[in-house]
């Protein structure tokens, strides 16, 4: 599904246990894994702020709590879609194993890092046995481009020299 195919809770498609749920927040996506009966597993900051706001704070946290929550509470007023986008690259684990792994993780405190251990890494690890995040890879690429640009400007002498420096 393309981003234009996002749907809201008013007209939801029916996710199946083990499906990855992509929630569209302003400026980024939050990820959860559907468990069934309206529940998802996801990671949220350790403090108890509301689910629909917790993902923004988690970007700046180093600790997160694995939670089982209602999909509607995690989504809030945002939109979401089912997005099992890595199925062609990584074969999904059997649903029973995904659910078992998920249930074991509920309530655990985990390390959170936007670039190497974020909510997308968490749910893809449950579904595929591999923690993958396209969103983190894009962020790493952007950081690399900015750093390279600064190096080029510095090398070419385009940044002004410090005042009072001897030539």
Curated annotation (Swiss-Prot):
Q: Which reaction does it catalyse?
A: a 1,2-diacyl-sn-glycero-3-phosphocholine + H2O = a 1-acyl-sn-glycero-3-phosphocholine + a fatty acid + H(+); a 1,2-diacyl-sn-glycero-3-phosphocholine + H2O = a 2-acyl-sn-glycero-3-phosphocholine + a fatty acid + H(+); 1,2-dihexadecanoyl-sn-glycero-3-phosphocholine + H2O = 2-hexadecanoyl-sn-glycero-3-phosphocholine + hexadecanoate + H(+); 1,2-dihexadecanoyl-sn-glycero-3-phosphocholine + H2O = 1-hexadecanoyl-sn-glycero-3-phosphocholine + hexadecanoate + H(+)
Recorded GO molecular functions are: N-acyltransferase activity; O-acyltransferase activity; phospholipase A1 activity; phospholipase A2 activity; phospholipase activity
Where is this gene product found?
Membrane; Cytoplasm; Nucleus
Give the main localization category: membrane
Q: One Pfam family name from the record? A: LRAT
Q: Which stretches make up the LRAT domain?
A: 20-135
Lineage: superkingdom = Eukaryota
Q: Does the keyword Nucleotide-binding apply?
A: no
Going by the UniProt record, its keywords in alphabetical order are: Cytoplasm, Hydrolase, Lipid degradation, Lipid metabolism, Membrane, Nucleus, Transferase, Transmembrane, Transmembrane helix
> Which regions of this chain are Lumenal-facing, per the record's topological domains?
160-167
For this UniProt entry, which segments traverse the membrane?
A: 139-159
**GO cellular component assignments:** cytoplasm; cytosol; endoplasmic reticulum; lysosome; membrane; mitochondrion; nuclear envelope lumen; nucleus
Indicate how the chain sits in the lipid bilayer. Single-pass membrane protein
Regions of this protein lying in the Cytoplasmic compartment: 1-138
Q: Does the keyword Cell membrane apply?
A: no
InterPro entries reported in the protein's UniProt record: H-rev107_PLA/AT, LRAT_dom
Q: What is its EC number?
A: 2.3.1.-, 3.1.1.32, 3.1.1.4
Q: Where is the active site?
A: 30, 119
Q: Which GO terms describe its biological process?
A: ether lipid metabolic process; lens fiber cell differentiation; lipid catabolic process; N-acylphosphatidylethanolamine metabolic process; organelle disassembly; peroxisome organization; phosphatidylcholine metabolic process
Family, as annotated: Belongs to the H-rev107 family.
Function summary: Exhibits both phospholipase A1/2 and acyltransferase activities. Shows phospholipase A1 (PLA1) and A2 (PLA2) activity, catalyzing the calcium-independent release of fatty acids from the sn-1 or sn-2 position of glycerophospholipids. Shows O-acyltransferase activity, catalyzing the transfer of a fatty acyl group from glycerophospholipid to the hydroxyl group of lysophospholipid.
Q: What is this protein called?
A: Phospholipase A and acyltransferase 1
């Amino acid at each position: 599904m393309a981003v234009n195919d996002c749907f809201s809770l008013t007209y939801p498609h029916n996710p199946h246990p083990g499906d990855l749920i992509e929630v569209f927040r302003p400026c980024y996506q939050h990820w959860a894994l559907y468990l069934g009966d309206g529940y998802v597993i996801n990671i949220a900051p350790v403090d108890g702020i509301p689910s629909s706001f917790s993902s923004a704070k988690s970007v700046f946290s180093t600790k997160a709590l694995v939670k089982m929550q209602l999909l509607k509470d995690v989504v809030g007023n945002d939109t979401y879609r089912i997005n099992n986008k890595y199925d062609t690259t990584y074969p999904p684990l059997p649903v029973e194993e995904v659910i078992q792994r998920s249930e074991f993780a509920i309530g655990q405190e985990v390390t959170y890092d936007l670039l190497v251990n974020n909510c997308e890494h968490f749910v893809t690890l449950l579904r595929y046995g591999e923690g993958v995040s396209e969103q983190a890879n894009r962020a790493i690429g952007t950081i690399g481009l900015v750093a390279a640009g600064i190096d080029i400007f510095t090398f070419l002498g385009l940044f002004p020299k410090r005042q009072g420096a001897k030539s």
